[in-house]
Amino acid sequence: MINFPSIFVPLVGLVFPAIAMASLFLHVQKNKIF
């Protein structure tokens, strides 16, 4: 539990932008289709 933040913080720092980019990409693709 002591090392949890040192693993959790970089993980969120990488996963959150990846999800944001993926959702933005899908949103743009959906707008292009329709």
UniProtKB/Swiss-Prot annotation:
Top-rank taxon of the source lineage equals Eukaryota
Membrane topology, record value: Single-pass membrane protein
Q: Using the chain's own numbering, where are the disulfide bonds?
A: none
Q: Where in the cell is it found?
A: Plastid, Chloroplast thylakoid membrane
Question: What's in the GO CC field?
Answer: chloroplast thylakoid membrane; photosystem I
Q: Which InterPro entries match?
A: PSI_PsaI, PSI_PsaI_sf
Keywords (alphabetical) are: Chloroplast, Membrane, Photosynthesis, Photosystem I, Plastid, Thylakoid, Transmembrane, Transmembrane helix
Query: What residue intervals traverse the membrane?
Result: 8-28
Q: What does this protein do?
A: May help in the organization of the PsaL subunit.
NCBIfam families per record: PS_I_psaI
For this chain, the family text in UniProt reads: Belongs to the PsaI family.
- Name of the featured protein: Photosystem I reaction center subunit VIII
| Name of the gene this protein is made from | psaI
